[in-house]
UniProtKB/Swiss-Prot annotation:
The lineage of its organism: Bacteria, Pseudomonadati, Pseudomonadota, Alphaproteobacteria, Hyphomicrobiales. NCBIfam families: rplS_bact. This is Large ribosomal subunit protein bL19. One of its GO terms (molecular function) is structural constituent of ribosome. GO terms for cellular component: cytosolic large ribosomal subunit. It comes from Sinorhizobium medicae (strain WSM419). Belongs to the bacterial ribosomal protein bL19 family.
Amino acid sequence: MNIIQQLEAEQAAKIAAKRTLPEFSPGDTVRVNVRVVEGTRTRVQAYEGVCIARSGGGINESFTVRKISYGEGVERVFPVYSPLVESVDVVRRGKVRRAKLYYLRDRRGKSARIVENTGTRARKLNDAERQAISEEKARIEAEKVAAAQALAAEKAAAEAAEAKAAEEAKAAEAAAE
């Protein structure tokens, strides 16, 4: 492995540690949550459409998403490892026989539809994603419970300290009299 490939692999691993993208391929309907900067504000915008291509490799890998907006076809290319891409959700799995679905540009209406994939591979991927999401929710819930318990313990300690201070103040008053 040469130095360039090694650096790209390190960068990809660093980005993948922060967020993980699901496994998706051309034909899948995806929702890409993109961070958009407008003036001083930053917000997350969802872009939902059909993934029509994946290209490149390593850190330069990208995917193209096509949607129809107000009757006009719009395509947008997203780098896989871009920090502006918050997350990618697979809405449904498509069954296609091509790696590049550029023929969808010429199609309108029903002829542009993609059949949903209900095969075993799609089921396994969907089940794996559901499992990962449920584990993530359970982890977040456990963190919330732990934070609530820590907050309750902190409040109890503060109340105990206040009660002790009040007792000491009463004892000091009694001693002063």
